[in-house]
Every structure is written in C-alpha cells, then in structure tokens.
A protein has these predicted regions:
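Gram-negative and organellar
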Residues: 1-127
C-alpha cells in the first residue's frame, strides 16, 4: 500500500500459513502461522524501514518433558527490524540496522532472545 501521493510512504502486511512435512516418521513436521507488518519511507537518497513479525509453530510429533501423555512442542516467534540506509551513489550505500528476535517455547532449551546491530556498506550491481 502506498500511503502518500508522492509514493514515499509504503506499508505491507503478509499473513502466512506454512506446513512442513518430512518423508520419514514426521518428527520434523510442523505448521507455522505468522503475520508480518512493514512500514517504509524512501526518498532519493534515504531509506527508512521498520517492521515486525509474530508467529506460532506447532510441532506434530515432537513433545516436551518426561513421562506419559506429554504436551506437543510449540514455539512463539517475534522479530523486529529497524533500518536506515543512505545512498552514496548509483552503486554504493551505507546502512545501519537493528534486529531483535525472541522465541518463547514450552521447551526451555529452545527459548532465546537475540539483539543484533549492524553497520556497513553495500554495493549493488544494478543501476
């Protein structure tokens, strides 16, 4: 979606349902549901993007715990991105980005948080 007449502000929403199956016992089979939202502002020299994703993974065969009648493994995934990019010329740009990720699961070993900061330059072969 373009949000302004000049076309500088854009937004997008994606909803996905993915089903993964293996060709064996089904141990790696799972279903992922997720929604992604992004907002972007772009000018001749600058690009600013912010976005996030929320999703859930339900495993079909994998369980959590010890004992009888174990619950199926599940995971909730959340991500966020913040990016600022400056075009230096037709091929080079400099950027700064921050990415955050969190997974919550009923399996404590599979739960984590990640914070990532990036600073770099990028070369493009497109003109």
């Amino acid at each position: 979606w373009i949000l302004d007449p000049a076309g500088r502000w854009k937004t997008s929403t994606r909803v996905a349902l993915l089903r993964y199956a293996d060709n064996g016992s089904g141990y790696f089979g799972h279903e992922r549901r997720q929604v992604t939202q992004e907002l972007e502002w772009e000018s001749e020299r600058w690009l600013f993007r912010v976005g996030g994703t929320a999703g859930r993974i339900d495993f079909e065969v994998q369980t959590v715990g010890v004992g009888v009648d174990l619950p199926a493994r599940l995971a909730d995934d959340y991500t966020a991105e913040l990016r600022l990019e400056r075009r230096l010329n037709s091929r080079w740009s400099a950027f700064s980005a921050y990415n955050w990720e969190r997974r919550r699961s009923n399996d404590p070993i599979a739960s984590y948080r990640v914070n990532e900061g990036l600073l770099g330059v990028r070369w493009s072969w497109e003109r």
